[in-house]
């Protein structure tokens, strides 16, 4: 069971307690800090849509510390990020692996960040296949389709050729923060919040 901290704020009409994620949402900050599952994706999407309705032009910040997760869940978040009309700042803290790396790269170009000791990783999709021989054939074909689809998305986000993405993703392909800049996964390494404020102050 995950413990969620609560914070207490003085509202002028008394004190009000709220969970830390709700408090961060007030500052247009969304946290992806676990495996990317369907329930998590629905929560993140709801937060993003709420922030869009609050102010369709003001930047949103997404902090990512995730080992990856389900492809469909990750793509749902990715499509929502692209659906928003505002700039999205992404930050890797700790790790952004697999679908986490894709979401990191999906931020607005020029506003994709990593902290100095972050690690990023891309690889090809995988999954257990069970059922009849016909079922196995269909599922294997779907995995190959998703592999090409994800490679196309990463190519668009990073500027790397699709062929290179596919080749690099054959095995777990790890990158440090500076390597991720060279790869096109992020745009800059930040060491303090002051540096991140420069990205959002003009919007």
Curated annotation (Swiss-Prot):
It comes from Chlamydia pneumoniae. NCBIfam families: PRK00277.1, PRK12553.1. GO terms for cellular component: cytoplasm; endopeptidase Clp complex. This is ATP-dependent Clp protease proteolytic subunit 2. Cleaves peptides in various proteins in a process that requires ATP hydrolysis. Has a chymotrypsin-like activity. Plays a major role in the degradation of misfolded proteins. Belongs to the peptidase S14 family. Its main location: cytoplasm. It catalyses: Hydrolysis of proteins to small peptides in the presence of ATP and magnesium. alpha-casein is the usual test substrate. In the absence of ATP, only oligopeptides shorter than five residues are hydrolyzed (such as succinyl-Leu-Tyr-|-NHMec, and Leu-Tyr-Leu-|-Tyr-Trp, in which cleavage of the -Tyr-|-Leu- and -Tyr-|-Trp bonds also occurs). One of its GO terms (biological process) is protein quality control for misfolded or incompletely synthesized proteins. Its EC number is 3.4.21.92. GO terms for molecular function: ATP-dependent peptidase activity; ATPase binding; serine-type endopeptidase activity.
